[in-house]
């Protein structure tokens, strides 16, 4: 039926098609022969086809969601291409959960005519897209893919997640999409050479892409950590030490400015433990001071949502809303909303990435803190380790652009 449908579509002026049906190149010799015939027909008709054996295509900016599995994500600036349709769905589900939206998404399937590299290269010139995100299982023409990725990363960041790393994974990939085995060390080297951010798993891949889509690139690798609790700061310092980032030394002028705003028991070092001094104005003021300082390249803010968590306990208690508890709850939630807004505003004014991390992003998504971060269009990270890993990729890509004379990102 597919050849007849393609001919009918071409007769009506259609120049692109998505083929969802399986039974082609991922199967036996007969299926591969059918796939070759399908490609020849598309060439004859002057059409391009995505698939076959794919789940669909999505373009939220124009309201299109044409895929088998149903995630309908918000519009945003992450473009997805994948050799697995269900991985597309995974990324779209994360976009829906985090409210960091999607510009385009396509399941490449068997990639009979168009491979992941073709999509990523097109994404790099798409005005709606800030970052490309892809899942691949195998590479048939490594030299061609490397060229496509090098051209793409000259314009925009590209994030890749690779399946089929182990022998068992390669066997599964061969039966899934007909992908050829790829030496992982060679693939890793290719990613580094062409400036691609390679992720270790689905969560990291989306974190990296969402960070590229919503944060400015850092000017350098010096990070200041602002925290409402010492332990979180210690763990974040460890994570930074394991990355290409550095825990910034507080310059004397910045130290003195912070010291004037916080109680005497503050940590007097980086990480900056606010020591209970997070009042309505001090957090926004310190965030602005730190982000604007020329010796700060990025900020990680920990502890957002604690006050709203206390408010939740009060709201659910037997005495609410009496005894002034309604006013206390409102105050705590407004505090967290103010801190989230201050982080986004300071980041935009200073062009410094400011990442907010709290486990409440997943433990209590309705908490006013994470909810307020989402309302600014940014990602609220479930842990500081995930924030550090994403920020590390931003710095590596910024350094790649600098080393290759690519200039600043446009838009």
Region locations from a protein language model:
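Catalytic-core regions of core metabolic enzymes
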Residues: 1-411
């Amino acid at each position: 039926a597919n050849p007849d449908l393609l001919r009918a579509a071409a007769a009506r002026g259609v120049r692109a098609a998505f083929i969802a049906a399986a039974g082609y190149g991922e199967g036996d010799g007969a299926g591969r022969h059918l796939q070759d015939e399908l490609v020849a027909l598309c060439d004859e008709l002057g059409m391009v086809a995505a698939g076959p054996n794919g789940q669909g295509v999505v373009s939220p900016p124009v309201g299109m969601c044409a895929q088998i599995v149903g995630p309908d994500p918000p519009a945003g600036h992450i473009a997805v291409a994948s050799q697995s349709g269900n991985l597309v769905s995974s990324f779209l589900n994360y976009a829906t959960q985090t409210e960091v939206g999607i510009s385009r998404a396509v399941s490449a399937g068997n990639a009979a005519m168009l491979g992941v590299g073709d999509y990523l290269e097109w994404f790099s010139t798409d005005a709606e897209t800030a970052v490309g995100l892809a899942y691949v299982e195998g590479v048939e023409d490594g030299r061609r893919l490397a060229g496509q990725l090098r051209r793409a990363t000259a314009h925009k960041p590209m994030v890749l997640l690779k399946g089929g790393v182990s022998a068992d994974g390669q066997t599964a990939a061969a039966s899934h999409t007909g992908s050829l085995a790829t030496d992982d060390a060679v693939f890793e080297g290719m990613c580094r050479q062409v400036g691609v951010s390679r992720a270790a798993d689905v969560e990291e891949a989306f974190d990296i892409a969402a960070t590229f889509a919503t944060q400015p690139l850092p000017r350098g690798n010096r990070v200041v950590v602002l925290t409402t609790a010492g332990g979180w700061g210690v763990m974040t310092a460890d994570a930074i030490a394991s990355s290409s980032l550095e825990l910034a030394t507080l310059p004397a002028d910045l130290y003195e400015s912070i010291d004037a705003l916080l109680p005497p028991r503050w940590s007097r070092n980086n990480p900056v433990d606010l020591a209970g001094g997070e009042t309505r104005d001090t957090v926004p003021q310190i965030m602005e001071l730190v982000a604007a300082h020329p010796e700060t390249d990025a900020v990680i803010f920990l502890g957002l949502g604690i006050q709203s968590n206390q408010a939740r306990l009060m709201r659910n208690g037997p005495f609410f809303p009496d005894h002034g508890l309604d006013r206390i709850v409102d105050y705590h939630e407004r505090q967290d909303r103010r801190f989230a807004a201050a982080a986004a505003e300071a980041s935009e004014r200073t062009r410094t990435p400011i990442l907010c991390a709290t486990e409440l992003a997943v433990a209590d998504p309705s908490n006013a803190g994470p909810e307020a971060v989402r309302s600014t269009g940014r990602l609220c990270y479930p842990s500081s380790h995930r924030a550090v890993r994403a920020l590390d990729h931003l710095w590596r890509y910024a350094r790649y652009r600098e080393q290759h004379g690519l200039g600043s990102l446009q838009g």
